Every structure is written in structure tokens, then in C-alpha cells.
From Swiss-Prot:
Homotetramer. Belongs to the soluble Thoeris ThsA family. GO terms for molecular function: hydrolase activity. It catalyses: NAD(+) + H2O = ADP-D-ribose + nicotinamide + H(+). This is NAD(+) hydrolase ThsA.
Length: 494
């Protein structure tokens, strides 16, 4: 029973983290604090790995040492700074590959990163997705603003390229708040105003503990909640020990972990326990997936609407109302400005925006009209294909309506809508063809409903709603209601 209750509690903690961090992302106040664990999957060492050679030389057992800052100080006392700096260079100069956690974080709209890591993987992950990071390594960097920056990366303990200036020994930790006041002030401000997710961080650094304690004194019970990951102590970790010794070590470490988690709550840091480190990637992937599913592509084109309604105005009002209700429900709409569809999408979206006191249209609508002539030696069809793949990759769901065009005086199904459906499926984006609107969307709906488990094995409860939106005889407002129900369930992950 205790194990079952623990599993329920862990699942609840994960869901709360996902919900709250998504909220922070949508409000543009999410931040990351990265420790050595974030880079471990890329092959870089943690603190113990960094100081193992130093411990061996001091005739100490690195596995028995818990105060690694003092260990670094002992090595410095005996050998000077150059040897320590060389250890940093030897362990962090290798060209490492980004891991999945880096890639996921870089795709999220996070503009603030704090890290104690010396490597440059965070910066690389951001540049790889076309973002422009502004990196702060020393105090003088605060006075310099990188033009058109997308994110700030605060490297409070230094950088591999300045190994001799990294924060590593007890002397440097003790003087951190004197020598790095701008980092301390900046971190305090962000911890008060943003929601942090701590990844790969052990909370052993005295400089962060000092900052957290100051915030606790200043804010009391009004502090903002933050979240961190810990791997839950597992009995299997001690199977290499004799049974009695393993049992005792497991019991001791479990108690210590519980106490540490409870202590972090004093600073409004909510620990989320995972069974294995891969679970962190799964949680981050869920956050990315749900965030993207708040952005909806409306794909479609039309020169006529007869398979759905007899007249143009009724069809335009359907598209208008659908777009308006999507924006009202908190979704951001992306449109390629398809013929006969795009204008109504814009009007419906603006109808809601202008009915409120919100005026930042870019928060609700992404317009990506297709290029009309070829450039850079590409054929126009190839350029369109590349363009489609680019803007579809930025959404999490795609709604397909109508889908026809005129060729040689005849109305035929639109191949472009078919292509966008195939691209979306290939990219793992959830597809919602509204079969009731006819034409290519009807064909795509038939494929989806016939192979429902292929597309929606994780959402069996939505099948009746998908069946409903394929029938043109239903009330148009009810069809829209069902579409909103589907995309809302997809965004929530259930």
C-alpha cells in the first residue's frame, strides 16, 4: 500500500510540475537552473568525476567525500590554481554532443538560463535552433547587451575558456557574493519573479543556498514556487553490497533524501522524484508537446463550399466562428493564408482580440503567406515544400477544413492540403480533419477515422467526437464545439 501511495504522489507531483511550468511558459516567466547533471548525458563529468584525480593524489577516496568544495581547496593548497584549472580544461574541452534534454529546452520559449556548468552545451543548443544567446560569464558582461538576443545564459561559476577564473575552491565560494554581486542580485530578482526548473542540480553550492535564504527572509510565505528533479533512492542501487549493509544504506539514504526534500520546501522549491533519469526527458517532452499543442495550424483552401454549405457567406461565418472560438479558448492560430479560408481565419481571430482589452495580435495569430516566386535556384514547388515543413514544425495540432482548388475550370481536391497532412503526421503533430467540410478534408477524415488507433491510440475517448465532425448534417456550432473539445483534450494530454 505504501508503494502504491508513493507512486500516486510521484505522478501527482509530475502533473503539477507540468501544469505550473506550462503556465510559466505561456506567461513568459519560465527559467532554467542547470547543474552538472544536465550535461552528464553528453559525457561530461560531475563534480566527483572532475575531482577524482585530485582525490587520488591526496590519497582520499572520492566515493567517501561529501564536501567536494573543501576537497578542491585541499588540492589547491597543495598544488596551486594551475593544476585545478588544468583539470577543468582536461574534463570539459572535448567536443560533446547535445543530449535530448538540451534540445527540448532550446525549443521552448525560455529566455533565462542560470548554470554552474563550465561547458557550452546550453549556448550550442540555443544556436542550433536559430536562437541568439547573450552569455554572461563575468560581471563586466552585464553592461554589454547583445543585439536581438533571444535568451540570456548566466554562467555564475565561469566558462571553460576562462578556466583559471572558474569558481571551484572554498576561498572562491566564500568570496562569491563580494566578487560577483551582479550575479547574486540578478539571480535574486529572477528567483522572485520567475518560475525556475532546476535540472541536474544537487543543491550543494553554498552560494545558491545563501541567495535562497535571503529570498526566504525577504519574501516569507509569499515566495514563488520552483521545481527540481531528484532520482528516488532505489534499493537496487545497493545490490552490490552485502544484504544487511545494502538494506541499512538504502534506509539511511532514503531518510536523508526525504529530509532534504522537506528542507527545500522552506525555499518554495518543490522536489519531483523520478525512478530513473530518463523520466526527466519524458517529462520535458510532455511539456514541449503540450506547449506546442496550444498552437493550431488551420490548413485549407476553397474556391467553393458546396459539399458543406450552399453559399459562400455561411462557409465564411463557419471559419470565422471556428477561429474566434479557438482564440477565445487560449489557442494560438497559425495560417498559411489559404485561398478562401485565410481571410476568415484572420477576421475570426481579430474579432475576439478586439472584443477584449488585449491588443498584441502576435500572441494569438501567426500568418505565414506562401512565397509567390522561386528564389535561390529552387523550384517554386520545392520552396513551398520547405516552407510547409518549417511552419508546420512550430505547431502541435493541425485542423484541416475544405481543401479544393480550380484546375482547368474544374474544382478538384487540393494536393497542398494533403501534403500538409502528411508532413504533420510525419512530424508527430496531431491531425484533426473536419470531414464535414468535404473535399480533401473529407478524404483525410475517412483515413483518420478508419485508422483511428494509428493516429489516436492515446486518446480513445475522442473517437466519438471525431466521428461527429465528419458529418455535415450536424449543427455547425456543435461541430465547432466538438473541435474545441478535441484540441483542448490534446493540449491537456488527456
Amino acid at each position: 500500500m505504501k508503494i502504491v501511495l508513493e507512486e500516486i504522489a510521484m505522478a501527482t507531483d509530475k502533473e503539477v510540475l507540468i501544469k505550473e511550468f506550462l503556465k510559466a511558459l505561456h506567461e513568459d516567466n519560465a527559467a532554467i537552473f542547470a547543474g552538472a547533471g544536465l550535461s552528464a548525458a553528453s559525457g561530461f563529468v560531475n563534480w566527483k568525476g572532475l575531482l577524482k584525480e585530485a582525490a587520488d593524489e591526496l590519497e582520499l577516496d572520492i566515493e567517501k567525500e561529501t564536501d567536494l568544495i573543501s576537497l578542491a581547496q585541499y588540492f589547491f593548497n597543495k598544488n596551486g590554481r594551475q593544476r585545478l584549472s588544468q583539470l577543468v580544461i582536461d574534463n570539459f574541452s572535448a567536443e560533446a554532443q547535445l543530449n535530448e534534454n538540451h534540445r527540448i529546452l532550446a525549443q521552448l520559449p525560455i529566455d533565462t538560463y542560470w548554470t554552474t556548468n563550465y561547458d557550452r552545451l546550453i549556448e550550442k543548443s540555443l544556436t542550433d535552433v536559430g536562437k541568439n544567446p547573450d552569455v554572461k560569464i563575468k560581471q563586466s558582461d552585464f553592461a554589454l547587451l547583445k543585439p536581438k538576443r533571444d535568451a540570456i545564459v548566466y554562467k555564475m561559476h565561469g566558462d571553460i575558456e576562462r578556466a583559471s577564473e572558474t569558481v571551484l575552491i572554498k576561498d572562491e565560494y566564500e568570496m562569491f557574493h563580494e566578487n560577483n554581486q551582479l550575479f547574486s542580485i540578478g539571480l535574486k530578482g529572477d528567483l522572485i519573479s520567475k518560475t525556475f526548473l532546476f535540472i541536474g542540480y544537487s543543491f550543494e553550492d553554498p552560494d545558491l543556498e545563501y541567495i535562497l535564504s535571503r529570498i526566504r527572509v525577504l519574501m516569507g510565505q509569499d515566495g514563488r514556487n520552483h521545481y527540481c528533479f531528484f532520482r528516488k533512492v532505489n534499493r537496487n542501487q545497493y545490490n552490490h553490497l552485502p544484504k544487511e549493509e545494502g538494506d541499512e544504506k538504502f534506509r539511511y539514504d532514503s531518510i536523508k533524501q526525504e529530509l532534504k526534500c522537506a528542507d527545500l520546501e522552506r525555499y518554495h522549491i518543490k522536489p519531483v522524484l523520478v525512478d530513473k533519469y530518463e523520466d526527466i526527458t519524458e517529462i520535458l517532452q510532455t511539456i514541449l508537446q503540450r506547449y506546442c499543442r496550444s498552437k493550431i495550424l488551420i490548413s485549407g483552401s476553397a474556391v467553393e463550399y458546396k459539399q458543406f454549405v450552399p453559399d459562400h457567406n455561411t462557409a465564411q461565418m463557419f471559419i470565422h466562428t471556428l477561429s474566434r472560438e479557438m482564440v477565445k479558448a487560449g489557442f494560438k492560430i497559425a495560417s498559411g493564408f489559404g485561398l478562401g479560408v485565410g481571410s476568415a481565419v484572420i477576421n475570426g481571430s481579430l474579432d475576439y482580440v478586439y472584443s477584449t482589452n488585449k491588443r498584441k495580435i502576435s500572441d494569438y495569430l501567426i500568418l505565414r503567406p506562401f512565397p509567390q516566386y522561386a528564389t535561390n535556384g529552387l523550384e517554386l514547388m520545392d520552396l513551398w515544400d520547405q516552407y510547409r515543413r518549417d511552419f508546420i514544425s512550430d505547431v502541435g495540432c493541425a485542423v484541416f477544413i475544405f481543401g479544393n482548388k480550380e484546375v482547368n475550370g474544374k474544382v478538384v481536391d487540393a494536393g497542398g492540403v494533403r501534403k500538409e497532412f502528411d508532413i504533420a503526421v510525419a512530424q508527430g503533430i496531431k491531425v484533426i480533419p473536419v470531414g464535414a467540410t468535404g473535399y480533401m478534408s473529407k478524404t483525410l477524415w475517412e483515413e483518420t477515422i478508419t485508422n483511428y488507433d494509428k493516429y489516436y491510440s492515446d486518446f480513445p475517448a475522442l473517437k466519438a467526437d471525431f466521428e461527429f465532425i465528419g458529418d455535415a448534417s450536424h449543427n455547425h456550432h456543435e461541430i465547432i464545439t466538438r473541435i474545441i473539445k478535441i484540441i483542448t483534450a490534446l493540449r491537456a494530454g488527456r
